[in-house]
Amino acid sequence: MGSTKTLVTCFLVIILAVSLPNNNVLASDARIEGFSFDNCNIRCSEDYWNDECNKDCLRAGFQKGGQCGSPCIPCPVKCCCQK
């Protein structure tokens, strides 16, 4: 009887552990409204991200600054200046 309880408890713990980490991410082709990919030039990296991108776009005369973005999942992430 004791081994049956242990076996059932282990089985339930395994089922619970397997069901918890549900990290499925569904990608969609939804566009961010008001975000333009027309002026994307510099490739973003660990050292060059949103702060640097925004500053460079403001210096270049883009009123809304800029942000790193990509129009598709396999596409490279670039600094996109916004008008």
UniProtKB/Swiss-Prot annotation:
Cellular-component GO terms for this entry: extracellular region
Any GO BP annotation: defense response to fungus
Main location: secreted
Keyword entries, A-Z: Antimicrobial, Disulfide bond, Fungicide, Plant defense, Secreted, Signal
Signal peptide from the UniProt entry: 1-27
Cellular compartment(s): Secreted
UniProt entry tagged with the keyword ATP-binding: no
Disulfide bonding pattern of the chain: C40-C81, C44-C68, C53-C79, C57-C80
InterPro entries on file: Defensin-like_dom
Keyword Signal applies: yes
Domain of life according to the entry: Eukaryota
Similarity comment: Belongs to the DEFL family.
The protein, known as: Defensin-like protein 47
Lineage: Eukaryota, Viridiplantae, Streptophyta, Embryophyta, Tracheophyta
